């Protein structure tokens, strides 16, 4: 089924945990196209596999910051990245009174005309003192124990009962941490459950780290790794602008049309994925097809021709089988080396088939369309 998820002051993953709990289902059965900001008032489509329509509505009226809207049966699940964009209503506060409406309007229109740096924001990194990319870095290195310890590490802003449970883990009392960790801390409880079940070895070291991570939803594990990719991307983009300026330069990447042979390969991959989607597992989890964006590095002749703008410049997320911009390759290596990651970033598999996958290069400069229109997702709230 597909339904509209409306939330505020709640992470997407936490909202889906609550939906699964009230529907008496598993979190792994729910999928979505992208995470939404915790601090925003957001609405997005979510799909759920073999979850009754009537069970989804049970969440309404139970949690003040979470509602679900109309639900209907669909043929395919949503997949991460399966969206063309987001629609925002943005509120700007504390604007100086001395600024005229004309000045404010011109500033807003400039966003649409000139664009803005396409940074990843807090929805990718989280809002706690232990960001998602810190866990992702450990996963990419295969440091399973480090990843578990990072997930369970104390953080600023924890409620007293959560802080107590985290401290018990640090003190080596896994059983006590499991006992005191509140039930709504699902990911921490899932990790602790496996760690306590598998116990310690003769040297007193916990042995279940890899299995504990495998107990987490696949989408959460990939989110951790995507967080690290995004962290590197943000730093590379900042370095690119600081050192090379606000105009295209030699070595920047731009998209080029695929050749006939490349287009045929893409069509064959899509057809193969469609054929594979006939199986029950494919219907449940979806089959992701990576359609390569063909790029090339700008030359001195390209710069002299002045045919490219900053909006044409693409910057790839780090991963395997990636074409990096020659003018920033050293910066990618430098940033990842700080975290103990070599340039062979995730050439192999991560825990439970988790890999840092190839991805579309992202525009360095993002554009904004200013056009008033009604919300694209209807929301109808019904309380039981």
Regions found by a protein language model. Name each.
Residues 1-384:
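Non-catalytic, substrate/partner-engaging modules appended to enzymatic cores
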């Amino acid at each position: 089924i597909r339904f509209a998820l409306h939330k505020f002051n709640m992470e997407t993953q936490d909202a889906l945990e609550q939906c699964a709990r009230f529907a008496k289902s598993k979190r792994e059965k729910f999928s979505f196209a992208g995470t939404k900001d915790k601090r925003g008032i957001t609405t997005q489509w979510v799909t759920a596999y073999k979850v009754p329509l009537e069970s989804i509505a049970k969440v309404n009226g139970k949690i003040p910051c979470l509602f679900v809207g109309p639900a209907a049966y669909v043929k395919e699940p949503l997949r991460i990245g399966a969206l063309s964009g987001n629609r925002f209503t943005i509120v700007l506060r504390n604007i100086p009174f001395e600024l005229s409406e004309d000045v404010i309007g011109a500033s807003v229109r400039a966003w649409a005309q000139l664009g803005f740096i396409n940074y990843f924001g807090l929805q990718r990194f989280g809002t706690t003192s232990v960001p998602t990319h810190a866990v992702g870095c450990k996963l990419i290195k295969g440091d399973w124990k480090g990843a578990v310890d990072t997930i369970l590490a104390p953080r600023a802003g924890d409620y007293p009962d959560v802080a107590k449970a985290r401290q018990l883990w640090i003190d080596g009392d896994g059983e006590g941490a499991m006992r005191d960790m509140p039930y709504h801390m699902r990911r921490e409880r899932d990790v602790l459950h496996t760690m306590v079940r598998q116990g310690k070895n003769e040297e007193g070291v916990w042995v279940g780290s890899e299995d504990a991570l495998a107990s987490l939803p696949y989408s959460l594990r990939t989110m951790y790794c995507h967080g690290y990719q995004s962290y590197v991307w943000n730093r590379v983009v900042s370095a690119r602008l600081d050192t090379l300026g606000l105009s295209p330069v030699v070595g920047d990447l731009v998209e080029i049309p695929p050749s006939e042979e490349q287009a045929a390969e893409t069509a064959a991959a899509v057809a193969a994925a469609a054929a594979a989607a006939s199986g029950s597992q494919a219907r449940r989890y979806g089959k992701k097809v990576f359609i390569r964006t063909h790029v090339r590095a700008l030359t001195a002749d390209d710069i002299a021709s002045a045919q490219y703008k900053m909006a044409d410049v693409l910057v790839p997320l780090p991963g395997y089988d990636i074409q990096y911009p020659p003018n920033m390759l050293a910066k990618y290596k430098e940033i990842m080396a700080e975290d103990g990651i070599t340039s062979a970033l995730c050439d192999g598999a991560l825990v439970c088939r988790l890999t840092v996958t190839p991805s579309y290069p992202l525009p360095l400069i993002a554009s904004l369309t200013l056009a008033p229109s009604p919300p694209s997702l209807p929301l109808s709230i019904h309380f039981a």
